[in-house]
């Protein structure tokens, strides 16, 4: 029996939910696995879900894949998959050392490969593509250079990526400018031009999405309060939505 305080404080998200759904499928004898997006490319967070392993339903739509940008989608497997082989004293994020992550991005979304040539690629053992999530750059794909070129296959489109590598001190360092992979498969580097500046005014800091309208309606008639003391005594209403 679970103690009542533990039940009150229990929080669940897509990870335990996906595991519960996975157990149901396996109890029914359905071959299944957990697929996941480690990091979204256009919002904070990630998503995990259980899926049946059947080529006839690989195109089944996952809600979060349809409304958010997925740079990579992986599957947890029993069999080993290729992993990065670190050199002496080379730092590689643990995710890319885990042999039970399989790239299944192309089962869900259109993808393209990214080919990069840049000075210094020859001097790194592994390169990564990172996306911005939760206030920092998160590595999402790993590849090994061949000469002065490095190739990243099966990348999600309409996404900004930053090519990086790691120092022996675990520091992330860009080895090329950030780039955009467009929907037609073309790659465009983003290079700042300090001689041609422009004025930009941001009216919001988070994308406005239609699926959020339901939540927005809950704020109607809400109001903001302010007080001139740390204890927030005798607050005054300053704005009503």
What does each model-found stretch correspond to?
Residues 135-148:
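Short, acidic Ser/Thr/Gly-rich low-complexity loop/linker segments typical of extracellular
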Residues 239-241:
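Beta-sandwich interaction modules
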Residues 1-4, 9-97, 101-106:
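Hydrophobic/aromatic-rich core segments of domains that either
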Residues 112-121, 203-210:
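A short, amphipathic beta-strand motif
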Residues 55, 149-170:
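Short Pro-Gly-centered beta-turn/loop motif in secreted/extracellular proteins
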Residues 120-136, 214-226, 231-235:
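Short, ordered, surface-exposed loop/turn motifs in non-cytosolic proteins
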Residues 167-195:
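Structured interaction patches on ligand/partner-binding surfaces of diverse proteins
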Residues 28, 46-48, 112, 125, ...:
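Residues that flank catalytic or metal-binding motifs in active/ligand-binding sites
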């Amino acid at each position: 029996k679970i103690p009542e305080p533990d039940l009150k404080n229990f929080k669940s998200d897509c990870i335990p939910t996906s595991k519960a759904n996975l157990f149901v499928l396996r109890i029914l004898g359905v071959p299944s696995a957990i697929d996941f997006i480690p990091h979204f490319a256009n919002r904070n967070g990630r998503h995990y879900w259980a899926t049946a392993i059947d080529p006839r339903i690989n195109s089944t739509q996952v809600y979060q894949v349809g409304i958010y940008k997925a740079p990579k989608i992986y599957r947890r497997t029993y069999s080993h998959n290729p992993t990065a082989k670190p050199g002496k004293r080379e730092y590689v994020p643990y995710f890319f050392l885990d042999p039970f992550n399989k790239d299944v991005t192309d089962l869900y979304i259109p993808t393209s490969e990214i080919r990069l040539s840049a000075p210094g690629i020859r001097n790194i053992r592994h390169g990564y593509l990172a996306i911005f999530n939760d206030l920092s750059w998160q590595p999402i794909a790993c590849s090994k250079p061949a000469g002065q070129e490095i190739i990243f296959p099966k990348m999600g489109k309409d996404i900004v990526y930053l090519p990086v590598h790691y120092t022996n001190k675990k520091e992330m360092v860009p080895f090329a400018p950030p780039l955009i992979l467009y929907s037609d498969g073309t790659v465009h580097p983003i290079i700042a031009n300090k001689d041609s500046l422009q004025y930009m005014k941001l009216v919001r800091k988070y994308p406005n999405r239609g699926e959020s309208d339901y939540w927005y309606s809950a704020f109607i008639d809400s109001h903001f309060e302010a007080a001139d003391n740390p204890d927030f005594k005798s607050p005054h209403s300053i704005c009503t939505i």
